[in-house]
Amino acid sequence: MGRTYFVEEAVGRYLSDLSVKFKPYVTGLLIGQCSPQRDYIIRAARTPPKEEQKEGNTSPSKLDSIDEEWFTAHASQISRMLPGGLLVLSVFIIATPELSKDCQNTLRKLIFSIEKSLTKRRLWKPADEDVSDRAALQICSATKKIVCRTYDVQDPKGSAKPADWKYQSALSASWLSLGCTVNVNIHIPLLATSPNHDLEKNTKNGLNRWSKQIEDSIFLINGQVKDNDIELLEGQKKLRGNTHSGTQIFDVKVLTQLSQGSSHRSTATVQVCSGSINLKGAVKCRAYVHNNKPKVKEAVLALKRDIINTLSDRCEILFEDLILNEGRCKKNFERVYHVLPQRLFVPFAGSNVMLSDYKFGDEAAGEIQERFVEMLDQFVQAEDIHIAEEVNTVGICSLSEKMDDTQLEQLTKATLLLKLQQNMGVVIAVAVAVFASIFSFNYFSD
């Protein structure tokens, strides 16, 4: 028996409009949530036209002219704009009858291309209960006939399976929301033995280690540790103060493991470092889960992935911005601070789920509005843009002269990293009030 996709009625109206406006075909992405029992589609977005296509509402006449790289880049951009629990779940083609016989092969190719691209960027590990089926939706623009099939992205040689496509009103109008603030303080050493420092690669390696801590953390939901296999709403009373527009909100605290047990011993290692990357700040995280008796483990998993994704995505955006505006970072600063982009949330009609995006301090609301139109084909009112985090001013200090041998020796001693036995029994916590997520590069010249 194939999977069943429950689809927001507004998605059906959007697809119907596209079938009238664009000929001979139009492609796009479908956004939703997987669960063991059923899947949900709550949003659709057509592929943005390339520059040469913006003059008119026409597409190339053949499906083999679809730019796979452009399509995949769109999926990567959209994945950054999704809170925890949501993912790019499906691809669609609306085409004339003349092109129908080639649609499924094209959809299959696009599904696996997207999965390959998104998997490269992920820092979290797939769970055993993750659903690996992705839908390929084909609609005939003349007859409106719908063909929905699924492909298992873990099985490239597998064949398509039929799936049901059912529209439902107010599908995500009362989904459950989980939110938390995570304080981040990540130190990533840059080894002196490395001939040159690939900052992006080193940052990703550091985030990989940090993501394992998040995955091993304990999550308190409304102040309680809940068993993974119970329903999220079990024992939960719906209070007036805990709802907003039909949304039940859960406040989550993340308890990160600071030390391992005495059975986990490690030998001391010394690393001589010529610099470091430090990530410090507080990040706002949010996840949504369906209201069809979700389990605690579904909700916690969605929030864990949002925590990991939001920090990883911000670092990617920052590096892209540095390369675009400044060229590759040069190793000529003693200490350089960069502010990571802030997170923001925007609503969309008919749902209590909010979409996400990121902005640098100098970005105007108009730029954010343009991005939502281009990426999600959605107009956003400026007053509906909710900035989740505040920003502090940071400075840049440059190295004016080379250090002598004595200074270098002192500096080297100061940057020795000792991985000592982890059951020391004493933990010193230093609280730092940081409102923004601040990204600092520390460079030490030799």
UniProtKB/Swiss-Prot annotation:
Superkingdom assignment: Eukaryota
Membrane topology according to the record: Multi-pass membrane protein
Transmembrane residue ranges: 81-101, 424-444
Record has Transit peptide as a keyword: no
Pfam families in the record: ODR4-like (PF14778)
Subcellular location: Membrane
Keyword Iron among UniProt keywords: no
Record-linked InterPro entries: ODR-4-like
UniProt-listed GO biological process terms: protein localization
Residue ranges of coiled coil: none
UniProt keyword annotations, A-Z: Membrane, Transmembrane, Transmembrane helix
GO cellular component, one term: membrane
Family: Belongs to the ODR-4 family.
Function in brief: May play a role in the trafficking of a subset of G-protein coupled receptors.
Record-given protein name: Protein odr-4 homolog
Source organism (scientific name): Gallus gallus (Chicken)
